[in-house]
Every structure is written in structure tokens, then in C-alpha cells.
A protein has these predicted regions:
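Conserved, carboxylate-rich catalytic/transport cores that coordinate ions
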Residues: 19-367
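Coiled-coil termination/hinge junctions
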Residues: 1-21
């Protein structure tokens, strides 16, 4: 609302900013009033993240904004697990190095802003993760170094590694499922934290605590710990007794049985993390196959020309497909398995008042 001499404005601001904004308004002769959101109003969601986690908010927002008043900020957890999972699935150190360099150069030269800056920053971080995991797996353009050394000297030079996914698939699967269980347990813990903060302590015990007993007990039983069987049985009994507590009559029994049937959902979620192993294997295998195809013609001039051509085309294709697959499946693990445990959506992002420009960048003048 505006007249010839006055302007009336209203909007939302974070509670932590009221003192600073109030001081600025007072210094400029403005009358103002702060108030909490009234019933029926629709305030936006403001997530205050540290710079390290801020970029990964762009991943969360692909799924949706948390509801206003949410007690759990998912961005720090998304940042940690997105960093880990993307690197495992892209899995080639040379690919990660290329991605890191491209992202770093773009950030330094183009100086993007807004969402573009956040996405490129995510690319920088996951590129670093890929270098780390690729080094663990000993994959640099697949087996390029052993292949080149064999073509040039007739002897293969092997790169030191900590885990060979091709030679040790079971260890790779255990690593993938283990990280998956940690991911799910964190999501369950966040759900319990939300319930407790909202005053539902016993719901957290019954709906989350008993499932911790079941899952941890089953893991213990699988590795030969006898007590794990009793833990799982105690958790199952707890779920059976309390699962139908909000229902009446026969529903208390059927509700408990229905809740206990949720074990199939948890097992399905855990098995879903086998995609970490599958994509990690596929990236290295395809890169290695390209190197093998390129080396079939031998060491002559034609052989080297063929090798360079197949290497360039094949590795570029594998890089593009690998980065797409790693992004899609990492997002899938966040959105379905992780967010499904605790995320409350339906919010809208807080958008601060600022100049929106397309082709120019406004810089703050230093006094």
C-alpha cells in the first residue's frame, strides 16, 4: 500500500534477524511492528545452514521444502550422505578429478550466483568424494595404468588399493548395506527426535525404539551374536503389543500384526542400498572394457590410434552415463529411503527481499 507520502509493507523475516532489521528501520525513521505468525497464516520455511551445508539445500529442495516449524533440518544429513553415496557410485578417481577441476574453474571464472552456485558447489564436493572413493577402489579411468604399462613395457603396474569391487564383491556388498543401515538408522533417529520435541516421547519409544531393537538384533544374529535373537524377539513383541494402541477392540491385535509386517518394508529399504555396489561396479567395469577394446590392435601405430579413439569416446560416454546414474540414484536414496522415515514436507522457501537481476551482478559498495 502506498500514498504520496507513506508506504506500508509487510513480509516475513527470521526471528533471529528482528533486532538487526528493527535497528535499520529505526535509523531510517520507519515505524514498524513485529509479530508471530497468526493462526491461518502460511509463513515460509527458513533453514539456516552453515556454508558447508547450504549448497546441499538445493538437493533437498528438489524433493520439497520442510513444513514450517519443522524441528529437523535435513540439509546437514543430506550433505554427508550425498557426499558419501555419490562418490561410491561414480567410483573412478580420474572422473572425480575431472569433475572437481571443471567445477572449481567454473566457480572461479564464471562466479555463478543463486541456485547455479549451489549446484556447482555440490558438483565440486561430490567430485572430491569420487576421487577419494576411486582411490580406495584403485580405479583411474578403470585399469588405464595397468593397461598402458602392459602395452608399453609388457608388464602390468598395479595401483595400490584398499578394496577391489570386482575381486571382493561380498565385501563391497557388506559395505553398501552397512552404510545403508546407518543411513536408515539416522533417519529413524531424526523421526524419534521430532516426536520427542513435539511431546510424543512414548510414540518415539514404541514406533522407533522397538524397531531399533529388531534391526540391531537381526544384524547381531547374522554375525553370530546369540543375544541378537533375544533383542529382535523383544522388539517384535513390543511392536506387536503397541502397534495397535490407537485402535479399539480387535483393531489393537490386527494393528500390531500390521505394524510388525513393516519388517518387509525395512528389509526392502536396506536391500535398496545394494545399488551402491551395482553402480560402483558398473562404472569401473565399463571403463576397463573400453581400455581392453582399445588395446586389442596391439602396439603399432594403428593400435595406438585405435586405443586413443576408443579411450576418448568410451571414457566420455562412461563419464556422462556414470555421473547421471550416480546423481539419480543418490537422490533416490535420499528422497525415498531416508526422507520417508522423518521428512515433513509441504513448506515453501523463505525468499528474502532483494534485487533480481539476469545479466548483471550488483555488488555492495564499501564505505
Amino acid at each position: 500500500v502506498q500514498t504520496q507520502k507513506t508506504t506500508y509493507m509487510e513480509g516475513w523475516l527470521p526471528e533471529a534477524a528482528t533486532e538487526k532489521i528493527g535497528k535499520l528501520l529505526a535509523e531510517n525513521g520507519c515505524a514498524y511492528e513485529f509479530s508471530d505468525p497468526a493462526e491461518g497464516e502460511d509463513p515460509p520455511t527458513y533453514l539456516e545452514n552453515k556454508p558447508l551445508f547450504h549448497a546441499f539445500g538445493s538437493i533437498t529442495e528438489l524433493y520439497g521444502m520442510p513444513a514450517y516449524g519443522t524441528v529437523v533440518d535435513p540439509n546437514p544429513f543430506v550433505a554427508v550422505f550425498f557426499f558419501l553415496f555419490f562418490g561410491i557410485m561414480f567410483s573412478d578417481a580420474a572422473y572425480g578429478l575431472i569433475l572437481t577441476v571443471i567445477a572449481a574453474i567454473y566457480l572461479a571464472k564464471a562466479k555463478p550466483t543463486g541456485d547455479a552456485k549451489r549446484y556447482i558447489t555440490v558438483a565440486l564436493f561430490v567430485g572430491i568424494s569420487t576421487v577419494l572413493w576411486g582411490s580406495v577402489f584403485g580405479s583411474w579411468f578403470g585399469d588405464l595404468i595397468p593397461t598402458l604399462s602392459r602395452m608399453i613395457t609388457g608388464k602390468e603396474v598395479q595401483i595400490p588399493l584398499l578394496l577391489d569391487p570386482l575381486a571382493q564383491p561380498m565385501q563391497m556388498l557388506i559395505l553398501s548395506l552397512g552404510l545403508g543401515m546407518v543411513h536408515l538408522f539416522v533417519g529413524m533417529g531424526l523421526a524419534a527426535y521430532r516426536m520427542i520435541k513435539q511431546g510424543h516421547f512414548w510414540d518415539a519409544v514404541f514406533d522407533i525404539g522397538f524397531w531399533y531393537l529388531i534391526l540391531l538384533g537381526l544384524v547381531g544374529a547374522l554375525v553370530g551374536i546369540q543375544a541378537g535373537i533375544y533383542m529382535a524377539a523383544a522388539g517384535a513383541l513390543g511392536v506387536l503389543i503397541t502397534g495397535g494402541r490407537h485402535k479399539k477392540g480387535l483393531g489393537k491385535i490386527t494393528g500390531g500384526l500390521g505394524s510388525l509386517y513393516g519388517i518387509t518394508s525395512y528389509l526392502s529399504d536396506i536391500l535398496s542400498y545394494s545399488r551402491l555396489m551395482a553402480l560402483g561396479l558398473s562404472t569401473g567395469v565399463v571403463a576397463t572394457v573400453m581400455n581392453t577394446l582399445g588395446s586389442l590392435a596391439g602396439n603399432g601405430v594403428i593400435g595406438w590410434v585405435l586405443f586413443i579413439f576408443v579411450f576418448a569416446v568410451g571414457q566420455t560416454f562412461n563419464f556422462a552415463i556414470g555421473i547421471l546414474g550416480a546423481f539419480v540414484h543418490t537422490c533416490r536414496l535420499q528422497f525415498v529411503e531416508f526422507f520417508g522415515k522423518f521428512f515433513e514436507g509441504g513448506g515453501r522457501a523463505f525468499a528474502p527481499l532483494h534485487h533480481k537481476t539476469k545479466y548483471v551482478q550488483l555488488l555492495k559498495e564499501e564505505n
